[in-house]
């Protein structure tokens, strides 16, 4: 019909537009995520993850925090941890220590599993990108977790933002700073949609416990299962991920290949996981929001540039005096631990 023909033409035009943007992004030099070069590239940028601190609605404390972060010397903990930002490339301090038990590292460790799940569930392919500068505003940038690059998939051109909270409850509603982060990502890449994927993983104590819970691929309560190998190489953690939803025979073949490939590394542990909570919601680009906030972000960046020259000492936290400490009131907090049995599955998948 005529209406179907029009819809098909619009779809093709949309794909051509996505083709153009993905080709543009592919030409941008992109250092690997969380490498020293990646952190250096982020130095001269307000990135999507901290842009919420630059808005007109941000508190003075938040603005002070981002300005200080962008002025003080950088300490790179390692290629899988967070950092502050550097003053000059000569001021880099580097440490190989990695806290693999931190909530941050938990998210880093499981992000590839989340991507594998997303690709498998939606029959798509995710392209990975480094730190991408805004095409118009040179002080803005973003490091998306990925973009759908399978052209015959209805999610073609849709961005992907992943969060793996270790303890925070998954509600399906992005926190305001995450929403801002995705708006900056879409604005930087000039794409109009982003899937906000939240996943939570629990871990088995042993291979026997893993095998006893349902089938090799699925738990008794209907959750996907999988395996990660944790190695140490050059003093840093290295992970290998079993293909998503692999059978036991496929796992055994993967095991041999993986151990052979990593024979120069030290094997530390095998992690048996269960994906016990998933939420995926669509976030649309809001161009008017960006127009309303670009001035505020620019003003914060102008302050950063000025104080890199004039000094930023006044931004640092003030040391408390003995008199300040004596005025503090001790507050007791009572936290009731949640039973694992109370964990709910959030099912928000839709055919958008």
Tell me the role of every PLM-derived stretch.
Residues 1-352:
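Accessory terminal regions of nucleic-acid processing enzymes
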């Amino acid at each position: 019909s005529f209406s179907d023909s029009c819809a098909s033409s619009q779809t093709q035009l949309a794909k051509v537009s996505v083709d153009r943007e993905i080709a543009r992004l592919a030409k941008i030099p992109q250092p690997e995520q969380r490498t020293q070069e990646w952190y250096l590239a982020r130095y001269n940028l307000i990135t999507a993850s901290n842009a919420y601190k630059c808005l007109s609605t941000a508190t003075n404390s938040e603005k002070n925090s981002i300005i200080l972060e962008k002025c003080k010397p950088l300490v790179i903990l390692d290629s899988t941890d967070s950092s502050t930002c550097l003053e000059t490339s000569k001021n880099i301090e580097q440490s190989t220590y990695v806290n693999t038990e931190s909530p941050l590292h938990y998210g880093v460790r499981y992000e590839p599993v989340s991507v594998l799940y997303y690709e498998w569930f939606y029959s798509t392919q995710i392209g990975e990108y480094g730190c991408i500068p805004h095409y118009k505003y040179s002080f803005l940038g973003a490091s998306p977790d990925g973009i759908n690059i399978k052209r015959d998939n209805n999610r073609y051109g849709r961005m992907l933002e992943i969060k793996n909270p270790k303890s925070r409850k998954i509600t399906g509603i992005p926190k305001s700073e995450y929403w801002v982060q995705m708006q900056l990502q879409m604005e930087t890449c000039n794409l109009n949609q982003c899937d906000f994927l939240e996943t939570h993983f629990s871990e088995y104590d042993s291979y026997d416990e893993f095998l006893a819970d349902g089938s090799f691929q699925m738990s008794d309560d209907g959750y996907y299962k999988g395996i990660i190998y944790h190695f140490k190489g050059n003093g840093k953690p290295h992970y290998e991920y079993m293909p998503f939803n692999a059978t036991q025979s496929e796992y055994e073949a993967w095991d041999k290949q993986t151990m052979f490939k990593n024979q120069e590394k030290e094997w530390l542990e095998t992690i048996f996981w269960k994906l016990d909570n998933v939420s995926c919601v669509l976030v649309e680009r809001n161009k008017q929001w960006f127009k309303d906030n670009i001035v505020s972000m620019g003003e914060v960046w102008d302050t950063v540039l000025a104080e890199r020259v004039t000094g930023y000492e006044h931004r640092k936290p003030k040391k408390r005096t003995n008199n300040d400490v004596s005025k503090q009131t001790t507050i007791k907090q009572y936290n009731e631990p949640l039973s694992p049995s109370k964990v709910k599955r959030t099912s928000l998948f839709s055919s958008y």
